[in-house]
Amino acid sequence: MNMMMQKLSILFLHLILLVLLCVHPLTTVADRNSTDWCDKTPYPDPCKCYFKNHNGFQQPTQLSEFRVMLVEAAMDRAISARAELTNSGKNCTDSKKQAVLADCIDLYGDTIMQLNRTLHGVSPKAGAAKSCTDFDAQTWLSTALTNTETCRRGSSDLNVTDFITPIVSNTKISHLISNCLAVNGALLTAGNKGNTTANQKGFPTWLSRKDKRLLRAVRANLVVAKDGSGHFNTVQAAIDVAGRRKVTSGRFVIYVKRGIYQENINVRLNNDDIMLVGDGMRSTIITGGRSVQGGYTTYNSATAGIEGLHFIAKGITFRNTAGPAKGQAVALRSSSDLSIFYKCSIEGYQDTLMVHSQRQFYRECYIYGTVDFIFGNAAAVFQNCLILPRRPLKGQANVITAQGRADPFQNTGISIHNSRILPAPDLKPVVGTVKTYMGRPWMKFSRTVVLQTYLDNVVSPVGWSPWIEGSVFGLDTLFYAEYKNTGPASSTRWRVSWKGFHVLGRASDASAFTVGKFIAGTAWLPRTGIPFTSGL
């Protein structure tokens, strides 16, 4: 099925849902009730169950009202799940269970925030305009669903699924959020096509005119220096001070002087508009060594975890030194909406870069790794980047991406544009003995595209790999595509023959995965001063 056919199929699904929900006149409450609406969602049973057991809802008369009800239902279930998780932790003494619980409590807290953000954005007070577009809402709902999956995966990392699964499964939260995605997706397809929250000039309201100047001449609010010449000698100390701001409007710049900072940093939720500026990727290095084998979840193994909105990093290396034998070990995890990484190096082995959720842009970055070293479920674009597979363990293959799209209505995926895929120095001597693939399907609807990128002979002729050798998981439902790549490995003659793999022939098909369309970059990147190409 070519790209156009798949786009038409997705459009058809949206339109069928829209027609089923909206075609009949809705003049009175008696014409339709919540059960009828629920029947038209992907998961009607948890929808019906919730509304049956919760009185006080006004019957919806249009699709947008039903969306609000679904988001309210999902948020109610998320609040209940988080409370139960918190309760379960009171008497928990097992270190692995404690680690998973800590992640899940945070993740469900963020899910509540994303659902609340959506609710307030799409259902403004009487007379007020919507404060977000349906595109924004789809991003936040996608994040809410990703959070629940990350919680579940964390319990699998540390083999405590029997402890976590009963708590989070009983709420049916994932199915309720999937229903929200389907209905909001129908509204988005119907014509409410915004890109992101913006003012009348097309720029987001959170960006100030100072941002562009900040990249040219840094005027730091705080300075971090190993030699004691700054305000602090650790990066986290400066981040914590920024997090205590009473007013968070405007960019808060932290200048991190050259040096190796051995610490794990976290920019928490609500610590927004942080900008970390280093002295260059070879000079300012933040490094840690956490790993799953060391008792951490993949999510919490990150040397740097970024959650606050609108984060920018420039000229910094994020490194995980756990090594190839320690399994999953993240150098950088971003869950920050509208985040930017410019001229940064992200270095590790397995699971180097977790593009966890939300909209992200990487420009002129270096990414090193072995197995699934760019993974997660953000809408992430890598432009003018250098992707460097390293030498893996004996018998291992390299896999560049493992994209985690779990629902066909999530507006997520990985786009690699105008970049280069080359062997890292340690792989060069043995490059002919190690297979390297551009991606494999971590989840059923995995989506990765490689556009106008130079593929050195490090890339296997087949291009892509199943999740496990011989497995057919996701091969019909994933979306992997290539468009006008160059280099020794760019020929698609020997590529996989899966139903979900596409060689794009038209610019109009490929442009759906560019900065301008995939992450709505023209609405929020210009005033940062970060260079970018909007289209192909």
UniProtKB/Swiss-Prot annotation:
One of its GO terms (biological process) is cell wall modification. It is an enzyme of class 3 (hydrolase). It comes from the Eukaryota. Expressed in siliques. CDD domains: PMEI-like_3. Glycans are attached at residues 33, 91, 116, 159, 195. The record marks 350 as: Transition state stabilizer. Substrate binds at residues 298, 328, 440, 442. GO terms for cellular component: extracellular region. Pathway: Glycan metabolism; pectin degradation; 2-dehydro-3-deoxy-D-gluconate from pectin: step 1/5. Residues 221-522 are annotated as: Pectinesterase 59. Acts in the modification of cell walls via demethylesterification of cell wall pectin. In the N-terminal section; belongs to the PMEI family. In the C-terminal section; belongs to the pectinesterase family. This is Probable pectinesterase/pectinesterase inhibitor 59.
